[in-house]
């Protein structure tokens, strides 16, 4: 998992994935397969992407009783994803069970997929946290607590807003991964996410990986948008024209 850019393949079919990836032929990407695509195409979509040379984040956000999550992770470990995730709200025992399942299911000679925990969705704000979820603690405090719990449970990192990456690193250590969705170019619409930042700011705030979806997948020129992503991540202010 070398590139810090995770491209969210939020498509309903393999055909649309192939169409989007065509301009990137020969360029290994780090891609995210979420519920929409995985539930339509199943494990075969991960196998296809791996055959094309891409790293895969299988974003299914497991949240169930510990034994169910353990058995599910045993199966997912054989699918071939490089990164998987759970909801930290499932608690310590569930997260520990996820690691147990991955350890048990990873084929001999293959590295165990890294496992990260979702702290709070980037569509969650303070009002929703308090009024709908009935969590009385401030959002930042809740995220920090979930991150610490994930680390104590043996996970490799968390999914969090870039705005939360710095204090998570401070609390959990520099090697604890901060994978941040809610990334938009400055001239993009935020859509249904409320805690959004630009690629440049995400790096400055301490993100290890950034998840980028509609800014790339709905771009008129995805290759050019990817080049812009690289350029902005590296501190540039003007759009580049070709990816490196």
Curated annotation (Swiss-Prot):
<comment type="function">
    <text>Catalyzes the decarboxylation of orotidine 5'-monophosphate (OMP) to uridine 5'-monophosphate (UMP).</text>
</comment>
<dbReference type="InterPro" id="IPR011060">
    <property type="entry name" value="RibuloseP-bd_barrel"/>
</dbReference>
<comment type="subunit">
    <text>Homodimer.</text>
</comment>
<dbReference type="GO" id="GO:0004590">
    <property type="term" value="F:orotidine-5'-phosphate decarboxylase activity"/>
</dbReference>
<feature type="binding site">
    <location>
        <position position="193"/>
    </location>
    <ligand>
        <name>substrate</name>
    </ligand>
</feature>
<dbReference type="InterPro" id="IPR047596">
    <property type="entry name" value="OMPdecase_bac"/>
</dbReference>
<protein>
    <recommendedName>
        <fullName>Orotidine 5'-phosphate decarboxylase</fullName>
        <ecNumber>4.1.1.23</ecNumber>
    </recommendedName>
</protein>
<dbReference type="InterPro" id="IPR001754">
    <property type="entry name" value="OMPdeCOase_dom"/>
</dbReference>
<dbReference type="InterPro" id="IPR018089">
    <property type="entry name" value="OMPdecase_AS"/>
</dbReference>
<feature type="binding site">
    <location>
        <position position="214"/>
    </location>
    <ligand>
        <name>substrate</name>
    </ligand>
</feature>
<feature type="binding site">
    <location>
        <position position="32"/>
    </location>
    <ligand>
        <name>substrate</name>
    </ligand>
</feature>
<feature type="binding site">
    <location>
        <position position="122"/>
    </location>
    <ligand>
        <name>substrate</name>
    </ligand>
</feature>
<dbReference type="GO" id="GO:0005829">
    <property type="term" value="C:cytosol"/>
</dbReference>
<keyword id="KW-0210">Decarboxylase</keyword>
<keyword id="KW-0456">Lyase</keyword>
<comment type="similarity">
    <text>Belongs to the OMP decarboxylase family. Type 1 subfamily.</text>
</comment>
<dbReference type="InterPro" id="IPR014732">
    <property type="entry name" value="OMPdecase"/>
</dbReference>
<dbReference type="GO" id="GO:0044205">
    <property type="term" value="P:'de novo' UMP biosynthetic process"/>
</dbReference>
<feature type="active site" description="Proton donor">
    <location>
        <position position="61"/>
    </location>
</feature>
<dbReference type="InterPro" id="IPR013785">
    <property type="entry name" value="Aldolase_TIM"/>
</dbReference>
<feature type="binding site">
    <location>
        <begin position="59"/>
        <end position="68"/>
    </location>
    <ligand>
        <name>substrate</name>
    </ligand>
</feature>
<feature type="binding site">
    <location>
        <position position="184"/>
    </location>
    <ligand>
        <name>substrate</name>
    </ligand>
</feature>
<feature type="binding site">
    <location>
        <position position="10"/>
    </location>
    <ligand>
        <name>substrate</name>
    </ligand>
</feature>
<keyword id="KW-0665">Pyrimidine biosynthesis</keyword>
<dbReference type="Pfam" id="PF00215">
    <property type="entry name" value="OMPdecase"/>
</dbReference>
<dbReference type="GO" id="GO:0006207">
    <property type="term" value="P:'de novo' pyrimidine nucleobase biosynthetic process"/>
</dbReference>
<comment type="pathway">
    <text>Pyrimidine metabolism; UMP biosynthesis via de novo pathway; UMP from orotate: step 2/2.</text>
</comment>
<feature type="binding site">
    <location>
        <position position="213"/>
    </location>
    <ligand>
        <name>substrate</name>
    </ligand>
</feature>
């Amino acid at each position: 998992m070398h590139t810090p850019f995770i491209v969210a393949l939020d498509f309903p079919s393999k055909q649309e994935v192939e169409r989007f990836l065509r301009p990137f032929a020969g360029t290994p990407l780090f891609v995210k397969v979420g519920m929409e695509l995985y539930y339509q195409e199943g494990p075969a979509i991960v196998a296809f992407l791996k055959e094309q040379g891409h790293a895969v984040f299988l974003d299914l956000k497991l949240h169930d009783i510990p034994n169910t999550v353990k058995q599910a992770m045993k199966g997912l470990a054989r699918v071939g994803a490089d990164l998987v995730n759970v909801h930290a709200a499932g608690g310590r025992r569930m997260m520990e069970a996820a690691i147990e399942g991955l350890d048990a299911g990873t084929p001999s000679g293959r590295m165990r997929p890294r496992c990260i925990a979702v702290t709070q969705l980037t569509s969650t704000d303070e009002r929703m946290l308090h009024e709908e979820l009935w969590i009385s603690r401030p959002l930042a405090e809740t995220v920090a607590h979930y991150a610490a719990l994930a680390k104590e449970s043996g996970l490799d990192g968390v999914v969090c807003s870039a705005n939360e990456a710095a204090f998570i690193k401070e609390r959990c250590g520099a090697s604890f991964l901060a994978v941040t969705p809610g990334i938009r170019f400055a001239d993009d619409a935020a859509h249904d996410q409320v805690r959004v930042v630009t690629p440049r700011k995400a790096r400055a705030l301490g993100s290890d990986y950034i998840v980028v979806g509609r800014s790339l997948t709905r771009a008129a020129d995805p290759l050019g948008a990817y080049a812009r992503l690289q350029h902005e991540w590296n501190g540039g202010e003007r759009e580049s024209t070709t990816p490196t």
